[in-house]
Every structure is written in C-alpha cells, then in structure tokens.
C-alpha cells in the first residue's frame, strides 16, 4: 500500500550502475535516473527523496527485485525508507518479454505491479538465517567438489588402468592409490587430486563442527533430528532452507515451496491434477527431503502409506508421496512446537 504523498523509488540494481524510476505520488511526476552503485550515491538519492517526501508528510518507498546485494542495501537505507523486495519470478511476463528486455522496462513492470497492489514479495531472511544458510550451502559446495574429485580419480583409473576400483575411499583404498605405480606425470596429477580430497575432508570437518554448534543451540533442529533418517546435518540443512515456519500459511504452502505439489489445471467445472514433483522454489530442500526417504519410509507412521503407494504407483512416486507427508509433519512440529510422533497416523 502507498499514499498519494509518498515517493516511490523503483530500482533495477546492478554491480556498477543502478537504474532508478522515481515517482512522486503527490504531483504525479516521474523521472528516470542512473547512478553509480556506491554507498554514497545511494544515500544521496535517498536523502533527496526523503527531503521531498517530508515536505508533504509522505515517506520514501524503495522497491527492488530480490537480487545479490539487497541485504546490504536494506541495512544501509532501511531506517530511512520502507524497503520492499519484489519476487520478479512470480510476476506475469508481457507478450514481448523475450524480445524486449531493458532496465527501463523492468522498473516499469515492477512499479506497475506495485501500484496495482499485485506485486509478489520475496522473503527477507534475517542476518542469522542468512549465515546458517551460507553454512549449509558451503557444506553442499564442498560435498559437490569432493564428488568431482572422486569421479575424476575413478574415471582416470577406468580409462588408463585395470586396477580394482572398489573400496577406493577407505583408508586402505587411499593407501593403495598413493602407492600405485604410474608415470611421473600421472603420479603428480593423482597426488594433487588426493591432496585436494584430503583438504576438502578437513574443510568439511570444520564446517560440520560449526553446524554442530548451531545445532546445539537450536531446539527445532534437535526435534527434527529425532525423525529416523534425518541426522544433524540434514536437520540443519532442511531448516535453513525452510526458514521461519511463519512464512508459510499452511503445510500445503510448504509442500509447494519444496516443489512437491501436484500440477493443477482447472477450467469451468473441469479439474485435473497432474504429476507430483517439479516446480517449486527451493530445489535443494526437495533434494534433502527426497534423499531421506530411504529411512523415513520405514517409520511406522508412513510405512503403510508407502506400501500402498508402491503397489499403485511404483517406488519413486511412493517416495514423493511420503516426502509430502513428512513435510506436513515438519510443519506441524515447527508450527506447534511439538515432538515427532513415529506411530500416529499422518
């Protein structure tokens, strides 16, 4: 909402320059500005807008899309403006959107949606939530790098040698790789890869120790850890990607956010529910939940539903169905601050 005394600053934020669409709601005057993306220039712009708004008793409304840098901008000007973060991915695309794209068009679209009262908003996590998510994402990045190194070593052995590739990542297997007779060049490259693997493991230990410290002070993570198949790392990771449960009006909203809601088509009296899975906002959350299904499906609370779903739809769809049930349980646990019940029917 806005008043006819306010000044709207609709922003297309970039690393070097920022496009501004300035709208004075009192006079109807609109102007376009382009300023360097620096702390001083942004403060100068806001102070100028604030002075004009104060003369008529209005406020400055800063509207920008959810992009890298929004957190530092909000910290810089949050006390001087009403800060609004737009979710442009949920905005409807105009017919020629794929042919015409510019900063001028982008700021115009965002401003138009805001004035119409239909601007979709993005969640603005606090500094603590952002730190926890970075911790989780750092671990995921290290795991992916570790997988890349292991795949390289496996591919090298498969391509150049006839050695047995089973059990390579045990202490015995790593000792075997270090003693493997190779040419001087290949020996050097393999040693580099093994050193990289060891460094990644040390970094993983540091990150997981930091996650353990967060876990020790987080009762919600400890409750989620009580679910069979979900350990400390997975509990922290799931909660970091969910964020405050108050974001979601219902369990179905959480399921949709994770990309596990069925597609839906309706026209007149015709309704059609499509495939489960896909879509959603947080693919990492979906991955974490699905990966835990190997053990979660055996919990008495879900076992009967899983067995029925396997007989009717197959194992993969059955796991998605149980993943939806798990998310409903997590929503209940976090929303009502209750512990997980392994027996009660979901």
What positions do the PLM features span?
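Acidic, metal-coordinating catalytic cores used for nucleic-acid/nucleotide bond scission
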Residues: 61-73, 99
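Short alpha-helix plus adjacent loop in nuclease-associated cores
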Residues: 84-121, 134, 176, 270-280
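Low-complexity, acidic/Ser/Thr- and charged residue-rich accessory regions of DNA metabolism proteins
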Residues: 269, 307-346
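Short, basic/hydrophobic alpha-helical segments
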Residues: 39-61
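Glycine-rich, often acidic, oxyanion-interacting loops/wings at catalytic, nucleic-acid
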Residues: 136-221
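Phosphate-backbone recognition surface of nucleic-acid-processing proteins
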Residues: 223-226, 232, 237-317
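Gly/Thr-rich phosphate-binding beta-strand-loop-beta motif of the actin/hexokinase/Hsp70
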Residues: 2-24, 110, 142
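Short glycine-rich, Thr/Ser-proximal phosphate-binding strand/loop in the N-terminal lobe
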Residues: 15-41
């Amino acid at each position: 909402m806005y008043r006819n005394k306010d000044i709207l600053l609709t922003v297309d934020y970039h690393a070097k320059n920022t496009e501004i669409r300035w709208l004075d709601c009192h006079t109807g005057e609109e102007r376009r500005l382009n300023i360097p993306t620096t702390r001083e220039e942004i403060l100068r712009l806001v102070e100028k807008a604030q002075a004009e708004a104060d003369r008529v008793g209005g406020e400055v409304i800063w509207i920008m899309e959810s992009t890298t840098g929004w957190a530092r901008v909000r910290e810089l000007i949050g006390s001087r403006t009403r800060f609004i973060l737009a979710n442009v991915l949920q905005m409807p695309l105009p017919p020629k959107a794929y042919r015409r794209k510019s900063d001028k068009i982008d700021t115009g679209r965002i401003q138009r949606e805001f004035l119409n009262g239909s601007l979709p908003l993005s969640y603005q996590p606090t500094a603590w939530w952002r730190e926890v998510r970075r911790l989780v994402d750092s671990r995921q990045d290290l795991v992916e790098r570790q997988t890349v190194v292991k795949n390289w070593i496996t591919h090298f052995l498969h391509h150049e040698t006839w050695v047995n590739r089973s059990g390579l990542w045990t202490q015995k297997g790593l000792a075997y790789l270090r003693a493997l007779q190779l040419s001087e060049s290949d020996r050097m490259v393999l040693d580099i890869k093994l050193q990289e693997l060891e460094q990644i493991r040390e970094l993983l230990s540091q990150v997981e120790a930091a996650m353990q410290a967060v876990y020790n002070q987080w009762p919600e993570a400890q409750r989620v850890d009580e679910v069979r198949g979900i350990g400390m790392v997975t509990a922290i990771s799931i909660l970091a990607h969910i964020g405050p449960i108050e974001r979601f009006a219902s369990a179905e909203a959480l399921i949709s956010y994770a990309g596990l809601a069925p597609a839906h088509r309706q026209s007149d009296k015709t309704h059609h529910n499509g495939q489960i899975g896909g879509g959603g906002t947080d693919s990492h959350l979906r991955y974490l939940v699905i990966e835990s299904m190997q053990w979660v499906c055996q919990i008495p609370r879900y076992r009967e539903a899983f067995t029925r779903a396997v007989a009717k739809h197959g194992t993969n769809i059955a796991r998605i169905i149980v993943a939806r049930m798990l998310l409903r349980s997590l929503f209940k646990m976090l929303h009502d601050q209750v512990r997980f019940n392994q027996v009660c029917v979901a």
